[in-house]
Amino acid sequence: MNYFPWLTIIVVFPIFAGSLIFFLPHKGNRVIRWYTICICILELLLTTYAFCYHFQLDDPLIQLVEDYKWIDFFDFHWRLGIDGLSIGPILLTGFITTLATLAAWPITRDSRLFHFIMLAMYSGQIGSFSSRDLLLFFIMWELELIPVYLLLAMWGGKKRLYSATKFILYTAGGSVFLLMGVLGVALYGSNEPTLNFETLVNQSYPVVLEIIFYIGFFIAFAVKLPIIPLHTWLPDTHGEAHYSTCMLLAGILLKMGAYGLIRINMELLPHAHSIFSPWLMIIGTIQIIYAASTSLGQRNLKKRIAYSSVSHMGFIIIGISSLTDTGLNGALLQIISHGFIGAALFFLAGTTYDRIRLVYLDEMGGIAIPMPKMFTMFSSFSMASLALPGMSGFVAELIVFFGIITGQKYVLIPKILITFVMAIGMILTPIYSLSMSRQMFYGYKLFNAPKDSFFDSGPRELFLSISIFLPVIGIGIYPDFVLSLAVDKVEVILSNFFYR
């Protein structure tokens, strides 16, 4: 038991500091921006310090545990703790949120509310990744919905109300299933509700009941991840959201769905997961092909990148359903890798739109010459997205491939088929991402346009892009840095499938 409440401070600090924004003096937006960025940096440093000095990597058990009784009536605790599974997403959250706050620099309308919402989301995300109580996990999960809805509805594009409503309907619908699953698991087989993760891991259920719980949780996480056919909110949301919101959506929000699948569906309901994993494998494979093909037909730049995100999530689903150490490690690496690459692509798409005010690819063209820095950065991240060797996406997808091939659960012919179909998906990825670069940057369309609005990336944009590019290259060259965080925890999770 750790006596200093590190995790409580890390979870509560952003939303508490964010609420002080409303009391800052009215001296323009600059004060609010700098205040928010300082809070984000301070939070990231605090998190890094707590993890470096108080977290043992070789211990697969829950660490930094905090447990305070909250509501006595139904045994609800403020229970936090982290392990190898949650440390990567928490650090990714801190990094991407700090950069998204910097990306939101041009926003001037209702600046106080905007920055408060960003910090409230920060708390909700870290709370979701560090909860060790099912009801607390649900509350933190819900803390995400309203901020994203407001960010969409207030600072989005022309169709912002449509996409915000679609987002809230999908995610709130998923949350109903999540709540039903939480209540079902908590109330099963005892007079007192049990919400503690540690107790629930050792709980066993009748097969039919476990399958019902599994489906409830699965629908909630499938909406957030997203898994086809529950993905249609994502392209609309990305198409209308401000690019700083897109960074948070692509970098962190989708990863919460993947985290929930591993943390709850795999860890708490292993029998049902082993029954469903062949179907998940098929869904993941279809998703890679379907989303890559659909992406190719999109005129809207942001929607094309959104469909590429859906395609990349297919690798995470396949890694989770492979039931091997290698596959699950690959899925966790893909979670981190796509968090960086997706956020960077949306940021660059948004800054390009700020300059040329065009969103359809067939209207663009020829901007590589007036904007060479933008061209270089966008091309680099497109290469990272199509899994170029030496970048993080390549390592993650390769490890997922190995996970399928070495898996004991599946016979040879399905493994060969799935690997073959995944390979087709990986061939489609360069087609849509390179054609996107070609339509934007090559040709002569905009070359004759007036040069006033065509200024290249400024120091803020360069700093942001390089800050994301360094981890992408770093993980690509030395993936052990990320893999070592979770490798012991992955073994513990998978031991449930073979020794239970």
Curated annotation (Swiss-Prot):
Coiled coil: none annotated. Its main location: plastid. It is a multi-pass membrane protein. Keywords: Chloroplast, Membrane, NAD, NADP, Plastid, Plastoquinone, Quinone, Thylakoid, Translocase, Transmembrane, Transmembrane helix. It catalyses: a plastoquinone + NADH + (n+1) H(+)(in) = a plastoquinol + NAD(+) + n H(+)(out); a plastoquinone + NADPH + (n+1) H(+)(in) = a plastoquinol + NADP(+) + n H(+)(out). GO terms for molecular function: NADH dehydrogenase (ubiquinone) activity; ubiquinone binding. GO terms for cellular component: chloroplast thylakoid membrane. Its EC number is 7.1.1.-. It is found in: Plastid, Chloroplast thylakoid membrane. The chain crosses the membrane at residues 4-24, 37-57, 87-107, 113-130, 134-154, 167-187, 208-228, 242-262, 272-292, 305-325, 330-350, 386-406, 411-431, 462-482. GO terms for biological process: ATP synthesis coupled electron transport; electron transport coupled proton transport. It is an enzyme of class 7 (translocase). Belongs to the complex I subunit 4 family. PANTHER family: NAD(P)H-QUINONE OXIDOREDUCTASE CHAIN 4, CHLOROPLASTIC, NADH-UBIQUINONE OXIDOREDUCTASE CHAIN 4. This is NAD(P)H-quinone oxidoreductase chain 4, chloroplastic.
